[in-house]
Amino acid sequence: MAAAVLGQLGALWIHNLRSRGKLALGVLPQSYIHTSASLDISRKWEKKNKIVYPPQLPGEPRRPAEIYHCRRQIKYSKDKMWYLAKLIRGMSIDQALAQLEFNDKKGAKIIKEVLLEAQDMAVRDHNVEFRSNLYIAESTSGRGQCLKRIRYHGRGRFGIMEKVYCHYFVKLVEGPPPPPEPPKTAVAHAKEYIQQLRSRTIVHTL
């Protein structure tokens, strides 16, 4: 009986020793590896720059250039970045840069850098003749990696804090910006609401 207990203790001691050795050498088992979707960052946004369109017909108007650019893993909140991204949506590139120049938020400086990079990319890689002949067709933010860390409190207590990151995506299109849509009237909102009610379907019926 004593020999069996000693054998179990010895096996447990060897197992603990191996696990400590793995941690010391930086070799973690697969169960400790972070495999969430935030680390699996897709590169689909930049790949849109490589789309090859078919040749245009002789009398067809020239297709405007489209520039996709982004910056990832920004140490900033995605919600705070979204307000700035929505602010410049639909503006010309010069107007957007002017708006961001006089905004004292941290995200405004980051978005301005991304817009200048996209503007240089348009002239260099997409055959855009005039740097100012661009407008912001799409501007949005996304959630990045979220890391949990310990926040030390008094009397031996602690809390969990989150270090959040975000992504910023922008699409520039060659040409003047489209005119803004007129605001909907109350009658138009009511008609749209009535149409939605009439378009409803009953679930699990023909």
Swiss-Prot record:
Residue range of the transit peptide in the UniProt record, numbered on this chain: 1-40
GO biological process terms on file: mitochondrial translation; translation
Gene Ontology CC annotation, any one: mitochondrial large ribosomal subunit
Keyword Iron among UniProt keywords: no
Xref: Pfam families: Ribosomal_L22
Any one Gene Ontology molecular-function term assigned to this protein's record: structural constituent of ribosome
Keywords for this protein: Mitochondrion, Ribonucleoprotein, Ribosomal protein, Transit peptide
Subcellular location: Mitochondrion
Ribonucleoprotein listed as a keyword: yes
Principal location listed in the UniProt entry: mitochondrion
Family to which this protein belongs: Belongs to the universal ribosomal protein uL22 family.
Subunit (UniProt): Component of the mitochondrial large ribosomal subunit (mt-LSU). Mature mammalian 55S mitochondrial ribosomes consist of a small (28S) and a large (39S) subunit. The 28S small subunit contains a 12S ribosomal RNA (12S mt-rRNA) and 30 different proteins. The 39S large subunit contains a 16S rRNA (16S mt-rRNA), a copy of mitochondrial valine transfer RNA (mt-tRNA(Val)), which plays an integral structural role, and 52 different proteins.
Record protein name field: Large ribosomal subunit protein uL22m
Species in which this protein is naturally found: Homo sapiens
Gene that specifies this protein: MRPL22
